[in-house]
């Protein structure tokens, strides 16, 4: 299993970096759309759609929805402050606040949505669509002036999330004693959680110094810590839905890593939340 995880990581990391820095806006949008379609395919299982045909239709409908939104906003990469994009990012904040309540009060909260495929599908839309626009909004930042400025921001969020996750794992292994959310994800501890946030703060400081980002350090730190918190919530939320669905992994598309959602669950929360804070709340970019 470890061998497959390492092989997948060595293949995926260069591919992700290449997609960030080499693809034009249209190419990046298409790749992100495909990733979202695969995520929708896996979310179908979390929503109670177990047959292959049902999940294929969900993936296709997701792709059509995102393609329609792109069609309605052909110049999004020149002006990311468009109503549809902003509504999607604000919706992500609302959804993740609701998700926090669902996780905090689980398993009691499951009584609200456990038997409703419609609600679980809505949760999926609120997870995938803002993630899609968060990715595109950050990548499109000042693209005409500097093709790589948006890629640097997106790479930062990814490093932040992966670094916080690694920090949480190490601190949890070394010092973990008190469970964070035992009914949702028994392996997570408060010590790991705090270690992850501390790691995120260090990354915020270090990356800000290296990349010379045109953002006040305090603003970057606030956005980064909130995004790191959101990444933990994204992980816990998917774990909650998987627990209700009775599955360990969301899929088997990535050898050694499970499914697409298993790899991007933290990013589905962190990316739109970070984008919303930076673009709309602080209006920094």
Swiss-Prot record:
Subcellular location: Cell inner membrane
Coiled-coil regions listed: none
Pfam families: CTP_transf_1
Entry keyword set: Cell inner membrane, Cell membrane, Lipid biosynthesis, Lipid metabolism, Membrane, Nucleotidyltransferase, Phospholipid biosynthesis, Phospholipid metabolism, Transferase, Transmembrane, Transmembrane helix
Lineage: Bacteria, Pseudomonadati, Pseudomonadota, Gammaproteobacteria, Enterobacterales
InterPro entries xref list: PC_trans
Ranges annotated as spanning the membrane: 31-51, 56-76, 93-113, 121-141, 151-171, 190-210, 213-233, 264-284
Pathway: Phospholipid metabolism; CDP-diacylglycerol biosynthesis; CDP-diacylglycerol from sn-glycerol 3-phosphate: step 3/3
Protein name, per record: Phosphatidate cytidylyltransferase
NCBIfam families: PRK11624.1
GO molecular function, one term: phosphatidate cytidylyltransferase activity
Membrane topology of the entry: Multi-pass membrane protein
Enzyme Commission identifier(s): 2.7.7.41
Domain of life: Bacteria
GO biological process assignments: CDP-diacylglycerol biosynthetic process
Family statement: Belongs to the CDS family.
Record's catalysed reaction(s): a 1,2-diacyl-sn-glycero-3-phosphate + CTP + H(+) = a CDP-1,2-diacyl-sn-glycerol + diphosphate
Species name: Escherichia coli (strain K12)
Primary localisation category: membrane
GO cellular component, one term: plasma membrane
Enzyme class of the recorded protein, top EC level: transferase
